[in-house]
UniProtKB/Swiss-Prot annotation:
TPR repeats lie at residues 35-68, 72-105, 120-153. This is Photosystem I assembly protein Ycf3. The lineage of its organism: Eukaryota, Viridiplantae, Streptophyta, Embryophyta, Tracheophyta. It comes from Populus trichocarpa. GO terms for cellular component: chloroplast thylakoid membrane. Pfam families: TPR_1 (PF00515).
Length: 168
């Protein structure tokens, strides 16, 4: 049974009802509807921590979806799953791919910055300050891009940039 037909909490039920109504009234092709159904099912599985199921749905949505903007969100969510699984190299790849299709995803820039910052901290623990600085510099660049897109957000990142004198 498709996940979208599974009953859940009130928010999930409401989202499913609204999504189904929109799919009926907005002129879309059957392929677009099917892609959205897989995307919605992927989001549902992801929110429950069922990452393998979510990835299957997202890959199927990617196969069907042709709109670059919509594909960017599918790729972003795949990146989130890889981040959650500690697969940072894969996550960065998917965030990059999402940004290629939609350069206005501050959350992708933020997540890339967080991964780079984490790798910088790992390098410090391993005693490699030169590599750490390179990772921190890269994190700073990504955070600057996220902040440029949404100036009121990412306050902690803004503070880190100021404290480390990386904010221009």
């Amino acid at each position: 049974m498709p996940r979208s037909r599974i009953t859940g909490n009130l928010i999930d039920k409401t989202f499913s009802i609204v999504a189904n109504i929109l799919l009926r009234i907005i002129p879309t092709t059957s392929g677009e509807k099917e892609a959205f159904t897989y995307y919605r099912d992927g989001m549902s599985a992801q929110s429950e921590g069922n990452y393998a199921e979510a990835l299957q749905n997202y890959y199927e949505a990617m196969r069907l979806e042709i709109d670059p903007y919509d594909r960017s969100y599918i790729l972003y969510n795949i990146g989130l799953i890889h981040t959650s699984n500690g697969e940072h190299t894969k996550a960065l790849e998917y965030y990059f791919r999402a940004l290629e299709r939609n350069p206005f995803l501050p959350q992708a820039f933020n997540n890339m910055a967080v991964i780079c910052h984490y790798r910088g901290e790992q390098a410090i623990r391993q005693g490699d300050s030169e590599i750490a600085e390179a990772w921190f510099d890269q994190a700073a660049e990504y955070w600057k891009q996220a902040i440029a897109l949404t100036p009121g957000n990412y306050i902690e990142a803004q503070n880190w940039l100021k404290i480390t004198r990386r904010f221009e």
